[in-house]
Amino acid sequence: AGKPRRPKKKKGCLGVFLTLLLVLFGLSAAALGVTFFVMTDGMKGDVTISDFINTPKELQGDQANILVCGIDYEEGRAYSNDPTSNDGMTDMIMYVHFDLKGHKISMMQIPRNTFVGDSVPNTNGQINSVALAGGSVDALAQVIYDQFKLPVDYYVTIDMQSLKEIVDTFGGVRVYVPHDMAYGGSSLQQGYQTLNGDAAEFFVRNRHGEGYANSDLDRLTMQRYFYSGLLRRFRTMTVWDVAKLLPVFRNYVKTDMSAGTMVSMGVSLLKVDSANIMMCRTPEYGSTQYYNNNSVINAASKETADLLNQYFRTYTEPVNELNLASWYPSSSFYDANISYMGALDNETKDAQQNNNLDGSEDEVPHYETSAGDGASSDSGSDQAA
């Protein structure tokens, strides 16, 4: 494999994999006791989600709904000088429905250029601009509640620049790469291998080349293999692994969850089999349209409503009419692309057995990287999360 070049800009979808990271962190952090509670003080965000859009009180012990955002603080954007604010572009957005009672998790990826209209002043029409225009992640939570009719209890925001540091702190993450990837001087070969920080960044950011006919949407699918590998890694975390990650979390993660809530969710996660962790994306009318010179895609109203009723309204009545914004929707359609973490795990295990004929746990190709000066996998105004 070639050697990936270091991108000139910190841009792209570096944060989606962290959806499970914070929840899983609570699991191992419980063993750290006082250290964990001290650590979470540095993660506490100043923003809180409005009580009016929370899960109804009578259901709060049965489910939790979490908005997870990867924030891109790209140089040149007009951010606040307040380091505690969530005022970057949320180039990664995932809605997580944790069925605490039924021991299931449903996660929905929302493409960063999904059209939301002008319900929040000064947006560019894309959902990833709402938190910046509205002054906080609470503005984005409100749009998701208003348009998708989904409650939001907590938020987690992650600085997108943290990916490489976290992966390298772990000494790499074992991932199944489902097909060869090559773009902009970087490449990965199909197979089960360990990705270091640079390789992981390329794997989750790339949206060009063979296998990426649908660009952003294909990239969302590829990222799930990384989530699968990361989940396996976090389930084997030791107390010392957690200790090494403490500084990273203090620097890059903000949440309105209390330490006790995070630990409780981490313990609840022990009861969730990977076969019961579902991932999907919002069904979309896929052809790009332009709104005020920004590319947008439209969430498919009926199909999205059906998806949410089946997987995200476990203990509430179905909602058949959403309030989604629309801007000249095209006839092309992309479904929710539902997959389960258990199936991804099985695919990875098969690949490992094929690569390691002796049945060992050792990965075969360790993907080494070196820094260089080259092109990013994203460019222009159509850069994706």
Language-model features, listed with the residues they occupy:
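Extracytoplasmic/secreted envelope proteins and their assembly/folding machinery
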Residues: 90-93, 124, 137-145, 160-164, ...
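Entry/capping segment at the start of metal-dependent catalytic domains
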Residues: 2-104, 301
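Amphipathic, coiled-coil-like alpha-helical scaffolding segments used for oligomerization/assembly
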Residues: 129-189, 256-258
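Second-shell loop/turn segments in exported
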Residues: 80-83, 125-134, 149-154, 209-218, ...
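C-terminal solvent-exposed extensions
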Residues: 114, 120-123, 256-385
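Soluble non-cytosolic domains of exported or imported proteins
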Residues: 86-90, 121, 130-138, 157-161, ...
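Flexible, polar/acidic helix-loop-strand segments at domain edges
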Residues: 57-62, 168-248, 253, 369-371, ...
